[in-house]
């Protein structure tokens, strides 16, 4: 499905752009640009979809399955409605199709990612900072200045908090930039005791 989508985007670019760019850059530079663009484009589209899941009532009906967890564990990530899984899968296919087709169209060659153990190098570094603990009761916050750029495990735990004051904040997955630009960023205090799930009215 991803290959078909990539081919469709590539053919569309051929149809709407009358000339084929001839950008001569070294393979290393193209790989670096592609890795960076995929990391950023993938993350901003995740923010947009996550924002919609919280603010569009019919989508919240699916996403609240994830937020109904009263205890966070690494398995909470799998507590997801099948429709939400489908939405994020389609998002991923679209992101990769657009970027891969655009880079092949612009540079006339295949593209590769810079990876560590098969993972985008940006995500690998983020995982080293403890991102896999976001769905846990291990409260890890970063320095305040860093939490303006990266979402810490504590910030995501605030996102899951049952406290109405925390609802609708920290919608970012990796980068906190989108939350900062859209007014949904919440810096995590150094120490805070949290309850999760719903208290009375369902949170958004």
PLM region descriptions:
Residues 13-24, 108:
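Membrane-interface helix termini and inter-helical loops of multi-pass transporters
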Residues 1-7, 24-195:
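Membrane-embedded catalytic scaffold of the fatty acid hydroxylase/desaturase
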Residues 192-204:
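Long, intrinsically disordered, low-complexity Ser/Thr/Pro-rich regulatory/activation regions
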């Amino acid at each position: 499905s991803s290959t078909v989508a990539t081919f469709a985007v590539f053919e569309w670019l051929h149809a709407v752009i009358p000339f084929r760019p001839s950008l001569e850059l070294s393979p290393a530079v193209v790989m670096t640009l592609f890795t960076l663009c995929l990391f950023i484009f993938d993350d901003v589209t995740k923010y947009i979809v996550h924002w919609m899941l919280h603010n569009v009532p019919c989508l919240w009906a699916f996403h609240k399955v994830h937020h109904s967890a009263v205890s966070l564990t690494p398995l909470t990530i799998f507590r997801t409605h099948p429709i939400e899984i489908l939405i994020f899968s389609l998002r991923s296919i679209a992101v990769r199709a657009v970027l891969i087709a655009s880079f092949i169209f612009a540079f006339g060659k295949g593209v590769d990612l810079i990876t560590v153990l098969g993972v985008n190098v940006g995500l690998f570094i983020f995982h080293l900072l403890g991102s896999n603990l976001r769905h846990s009761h291990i409260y890890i916050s970063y320095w305040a200045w860093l939490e303006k750029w990266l979402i810490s495990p504590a910030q995501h735990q605030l996102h899951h908090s049952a406290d109405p004051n925390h609802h609708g904040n920290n919608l970012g997955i990796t980068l906190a930039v989108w939350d900062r630009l859209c007014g949904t960023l919440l810096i995590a205090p150094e120490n805070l005791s949290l309850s999760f799930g719903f208290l009375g009215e369902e949170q958004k």
